[in-house]
Every structure is written in structure tokens, then in C-alpha cells.
Amino acid sequence: EKNIKEDLTEIEINPHVDPNITFGVELECSHKLNTSYIALGTLYNNWHFKEEGTVYNGVEITSPILNYTNEDMKRLKCICDFLNENGFKTTKDCGGHIHFGFDYIESITHLQLLYYIYVNTEEILSYMFNKEGTILREGAIANAPFINENILNLYGKYIQTYANNLKSFATLLGNAQKDRYASLNIKNAFSLDKNTIELRIPNGTLEFNELNLNIILFTRIMQKSKYF
């Protein structure tokens, strides 16, 4: 087994991403010695290894809270390198979930615009959030179904709402998606445990470059909807 090595070289990060946006990744994958890694529990600065029951020999690696900084992105790259060098693989059953800090959302209008961008381009985004030349995994139909039909039927193209505060609006959007299994999951918003909005549509990947692109794309949507 190769060790996790801290790569001291600088990596190229997108200068337009707001480093104040927090995020965390859930890397679903498979390994023939999955139980051994799960037994370790934690590796490398609080990255957690736990069982992933939806994947054969499944392991889920969850990150600590990260920011889009050179230091944190180097840590993400080190984990990806370690997994790739030690026999971890993604399968057709793996999803790639990324949580983004909901505290970045400051107003009803900000959330309206984020959903306006997302639900009106959801099908296109489902391709953009996945590696070029790949198709959306079959499991996404059950574990990350599109939300656009439910949201648009309830709130219209411009996501109109009579909610009088951000928390109640987030709750209404969460009710519209029915359960947490949605391409964009807002049910964690305002929870004490995990105040996030979760992107669930990407296929599973252990490729740093793909994760980086997905983080950039969604954080830029969050930023543009704030300053639109």
C-alpha cells in the first residue's frame, strides 16, 4: 500500500471561485479490501472511510469541510492520488456527491436565482457535471432524479414564492423534491448537523480534475445567482 503523500507543488485553481464558499465531497468507490479500510475509520486530516451499501465492496470517503484554496485543493488531490494508486475504483453504481455550504445563500432572491439557473438547465447540467463522453449512471434515476418538473410545476419558470423568509422558502423547495434523493438536495439547509445544499447528479469519480471542474461549475452558479 502506498502512503498518502503531501504534494508540495502548487496546483492551478480557478481565481474566480469565492474561497468563502465551503464544500465537502463524498467519494463512492469499491475496493476488494473495503472492510480493512473501513475499520481504519479516519485517514489524513479527518477524511472518513465508511461502508457504502449501494456499491459492491463499497467504500465512501467523506472529506472534512473544505474551501477553494490551494491548500485544501492539494489535500483533495492527495486523497484522489492515494485512492487511484491503491486499487480503489468507481463502478456504474457510484455517485459523486458534493455538499456546498448553504450559509453562502443570503436571501430569497439569491436562492430563487440559483434554482432558476439550475432547474431551467438541469438536463444540460447533467452532462456538464459528468466526464466528457460518459452517460449518466442508471442509478441516478432512483438516487438523484431530476427536480425540474416538480419545481417548475409548483413555482413556474421564475421560481416565484410567497415565502417571507429564506428558511421557509428552503423548506418549501425541500418539500417539492419529496425526499433527499434528488439531483439537487436542499433538505439539509438550516440543519444544525449539515447546513448544505447537496449536488447529487454527478457520476462517481476519483479523478481530481473532474471533481475540480464540478466544484468550479456549481460554485460559479452560486456566485452568479448572488450578484445577478
What residue spans do the PLM features occupy?
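C-terminal accessory/tail domains of diverse enzymes
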Residues: 1-90, 103-228
